[in-house]
């Protein structure tokens, strides 16, 4: 796992960008984006909320390949709950499996649960280390 500071969107189109997500849906069945990278992604790609909503409705709150070099990484059950270290650990394993089966070579992940979620990086980092090899860059937004 590589760690660096920077703007995750400077890698758009070059790497798979991972969006931290939750399992909440609107009445219309669209995913509820949190703040940060996921909100920015929905602003750039409005189709994300509908597609992710369909996937959550069909398969639950899991890691998904959204296409267009975007993937999801659940960190909490709902948009109103706190990030859960157990969900983050499960998502790390699922993302590694998806990266392996998809042949992804460069994956950018924001620090899960550490921005608006309030978790400390020193508590989250050990959950990612067993799963994230040198294809994974965890980026701390500047």
Describe the function of each predicted region.
Residues 1-142:
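Macrodomain-like recognition of ADP-ribose-binding/processing modules
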